[in-house]
Amino acid sequence: MTDTLPPNRVVFVHAHPDDETIGTGATMAYYAADPDTHVTLVTCTLGEEGEIHVPELSQLAAAEADQLGGWRLHEWHMSCDALGVADRRMLGGPGAYRDSGMMDTPANKHPRAFWGADLTEAAAHLVAILRELRPQVLVTYDPNGFYGHPDHIQAHRVSVKAAELAADADFRPELGEAHKVSKFYWTTVPKSALATMFEEFSQSDDNPFEGVTSVDDLPFGVDDSEVTTVIQGKGFGEAKLASVRAHATQIPPDNWLAVMAAKVGVDATTTEHYILVDGKRGPADPETGWETDLFA
């Protein structure tokens, strides 16, 4: 299949519909607009346990009709359309794995909860995709799943396992020829960026950090020295915001990205950061010391 694909290929692995847009939306739109790059999104669950911010849809909740997953699948498709990502896939197919809910909740024990999925079995689904597409780049979360959600942590574990197994010619050869990903990234946010946002919103009625006294108290964010890569997706802010709006059940209209865009301009939402954990770093920007291209 790679004979018919562009020369550059990247796979993003996310836990739920809407996760693709917050931390990687501008990056995905930026590369999807490049005719020499093929972008694939793999999402692991339908997000059945999510909150609902549209009152008239409240009965779709897991505790009611339990139909939120199907609705969110529709939102996910609209989000991908906004980002220009045509190749979007559900790990194992839609509904193979269920949203596990927040840590230490009953949803963790659901028979189909992604949190309880057999790691090798789940990874094999991703191995098949990696061997089919043969991407140079794989992107997912850090070991804490960015902020500690069980499905984010499991998405990290599955991605790590799949990258290992995809390169092992002895593992499930029927899934395709072995393939080694050249560069493996985790999503992240540097504390300097959080500090800027913290200050920007400190006197705002729309403060997403309300009740937080320091960026060090947040469950995410790393020292700038840990960051290796920044993607400046300027020109793709409107695409990212359209992607955010597509997830209406999960992200209210007055979300912090929309507020930031209104306050300081849409381009402020398009800077996204990563940590390269496997592979060779590309040329660094002389000012930041960070590489500026996932494929460099």
UniProtKB/Swiss-Prot annotation:
Catalyzes the deacetylation of 1D-myo-inositol 2-acetamido-2-deoxy-alpha-D-glucopyranoside (GlcNAc-Ins) in the mycothiol biosynthesis pathway. This is 1D-myo-inositol 2-acetamido-2-deoxy-alpha-D-glucopyranoside deacetylase. The keyword Hydrolase applies. Binds 1 zinc ion per subunit. Its cofactor is Zn(2+). Its EC number is 3.5.1.103. Belongs to the MshB deacetylase family. It catalyses: 1D-myo-inositol 2-acetamido-2-deoxy-alpha-D-glucopyranoside + H2O = 1D-myo-inositol 2-amino-2-deoxy-alpha-D-glucopyranoside + acetate. Pfam families: PIG-L. One of its GO terms (molecular function) is zinc ion binding. One of its GO terms (biological process) is mycothiol biosynthetic process.
